[in-house]
A protein has these predicted regions:
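Histidine-anchored nucleotide/phosphate-binding helix
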Residues: 19-21
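Membrane-interfacial amphipathic helices and adjacent loop/beta segments
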Residues: 34, 39-45
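Active-site-adjacent pocket-lining segments in enzyme domains
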Residues: 3-12, 26-36, 52-168
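Short gly/ser/thr-rich secondary-structure transition/capping motifs
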Residues: 45-53
Length: 168
């Protein structure tokens, strides 16, 4: 069974996170939500959720997919976590799927050097967080093992794309 990790940090966009979690779980993917800023996470719109695990509990596991939802300051909270960055880079370097939506492609993935210009999308206005990278306006983009999506309106399509990539 494929295994996915979804990062949850205070200030994240919960509809992006939970839409992807729901779609992946319906497809039989073993999904873990991991609290980065605490076991209970409060979204950018004050929705509170309890993560399945704390990030520190699963930091040494191997993942078929890791996913960073957007939202502010959720994306900056993810980007400031050395454990999040390490898991993303480890997953990417193993050739497994790394995915981000909304602000996170620019804020989280941009500084890690895993996005190529013209081969990623992000929420309009977040491009400045990743100087030197040209983002495109498409809804969902796959570039090798990096999958990015533009905004909450694309979360369902992103989830379906991730299933097709994981399950072939």
């Amino acid at each position: 069974m494929k295994k996915a990790l979804v990062f949850l940090a205070d200030g994240c966009e919960m509809c992006e996170a939970l839409c992807v979690v729901d779609v992946l779980r319906r497809a039989g993917i073993n999904v873990f939500t991991a609290g980065v800023t605490g076991e209970r996470v409060v979204s950018s719109h004050n929705v509170e959720i309890k993560a399945d695990v704390m990030l520190s509990e699963v930091k040494n596991e191997e993942w078929d997919l890791v996913f960073a939802p957007g939202g502010m300051p959720g994306a900056t909270n993810l980007a400031s976590s050395s454990i999040v960055n390490s898991i993303i880079l480890d997953t990417y370097n193993k050739g497994n799927i790394v995915s981000a939506i909304c602000a996170s492609p620019a804020v989280v993935f941009g500084p890690l050097g895993i996005i190529k210009s013209g081969k990623a999308t992000c929420y309009p206005g977040c491009e400045d967080y990743a100087p030197g990278i040209e983002f495109v306006s498409d809804g969902v983009i796959v570039d090798g093992n990096v999958v990015t999506a533009k905004s909450a309106g694309w979360a369902f399509d992103l989830g379906l794309k991730l299933i097709s990539l994981l399950e072939g």
